[in-house]
Regions:
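The feature captures the conserved acid-bearing segment of alpha/beta-hydrolase catalytic domains
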Residues: 188-268, 272-278
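Histidine-bearing beta->alpha loop at or near hydrolase active sites
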Residues: 289-293
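Sec-dependent signal peptide recognition
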Residues: 1-9
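The conserved beta1-alpha1 loop
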Residues: 81-87, 194, 217-218, 288
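Post-His helix in hydrolase/transferase enzymes
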Residues: 297-305
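A domain-start/cap signature at the N-terminus of enzymes
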Residues: 15-79, 91, 105, 138, ...
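Hydrophobic h-region of N-terminal signal peptides that target proteins for export
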Residues: 9-15
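Serine-hydrolase catalytic machinery in alpha/beta-hydrolase-like enzymes
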Residues: 53-70, 74-165, 174-178, 182, ...
Length: 322
């Protein structure tokens, strides 16, 4: 049934976001109390977006937060992190993901953090996420940065602590895997678009619960190759899928379905690992001609943002929501 639903979503682009709330009251803990030294400044950026700035480990960091105007603060609200790619920006991520409209429709909050600048002997960038691999020379603690944002969000909003998710493009996808491994107690599920796991994330991964994983990738991606990149410390996509299928005790081999778009000259392969613990799932969507991009229905018959929310919203920290 789940396989048919996702394939229908890809073919028709008509699936709305999921969103059934789970009864997680017994898991809720009181929001943290700010230490006296913590200071955060939030300003109105328009269109229901706030820009919040604070100093983290002696670096000025910021994030953009979108709260739908019609959000019900009396009900527990799911929270989605959307992480930009290497050298990218939070504002650009807002534009190409279009998660705001999905948040309006499905009642969740979206946070778009901004990565810190990075300079090493090999590379230099205006922004990055420290997830190992080619960013291993960084001394930025992005896991703690994200957790600090979570703690602040709990103070300001009625966040459902069992339904905090992460997704990202490229380096943001790598970071989402890194959070699944290193902030597992806070992150219910993740989705990666054109990202993978770095060698460090893969080797040191220590999740605390079965974790739903969605990977969307292009077979022709030259930046994060499907087969991996040893020089830059990138695991192959099959290696990443196999890691999570094994950790979640899924069936060793996936169920595979292929949607052919003959007129457009491409196909989309869908791999679904079944019978995982807590009814979670590990899923790979592989587009035959996609390169390094965030796909949508109009360009590649693949509505990534809709598919991501439909996938993530099925789960909380305890697995599939009843």
């Amino acid at each position: 049934m789940k396989l048919k639903l996702l394939l229908t979503c890809f073919l028709l682009a008509s699936c709305g976001g999921g969103g059934g709330e789970s009864d997680t009251g017994s898991d809720r803990v009181d929001p943290p109390i700010n230490p006296p030294s913590f200071s955060e400044e939030c300003i109105d950026a328009g269109l229901n977006i706030e820009r919040c700035t604070f100093t983290h480990n002696n670096i000025e960091r910021y994030y953009l937060i979108y709260v739908p105007a019609n959000i019900d603060q009396n009900s527990e609200i799911p929270l989605l992190f959307s992480l930009h790619g290497y050298g990218g920006s939070a504002i650009r991520n807002i534009e190409y993901t279009n998660f705001r409209s999905l948040a309006d429709e499905n009642g969740f909050i979206v946070i778009f953090p901004q990565g810190a600048p990075f300079t090493s002997q090999l590379v230099s960038s205006s922004s990055h996420w420290n997830s190992g691999g080619w960013t291993s020379g960084s001394d930025v603690d992005d896991v703690d940065f994200i957790e600090t944002i979570i703690d602040q969000s709990l103070i300001k909003h009625n966040i459902n602590q069992s339904r905090i998710y992460s997704t990202g493009m490229s380096n943001g996808g790598f970071m989402s895997y890194h959070l699944a491994c290193n902030l597992s107690s806070r992150i219910a599920a993740i989705a990666s678009v054109t990202g993978s796991m770095t060698f460090e994330t893969y080797d040191e991964c220590n999740p605390s619960h079965p974790t739903p994983i969605l990977q969307i990738h292009g077979a022709l991606d030259p930046t994060v190759p499907f087969s991996g990149n040893t020089t830059l410390g990138m695991k192959s996509i099959p290696d990443s899928m196999n890691y999570w299928a094994t950790f979640n005790s899924c069936d060793a081999e996936p169920v595979i379905a292929i949607a052919d778009f003959f007129d457009e000259g491409y196909s989309i392969q869908y791999d679904y690992y079944e019978n995982c613990m807590n009814n979670v799932s590990v899923e790979l969507v592989l587009h035959s001609t996609m390169r390094h991009t965030w796909p949508n229905f109009d360009s590649l018959s693949l509505p990534a943002s809709i598919s991501i929310w439909d996938f993530l919203s099925q789960y909380d920290l305890n697995g599939l929501i009843d």
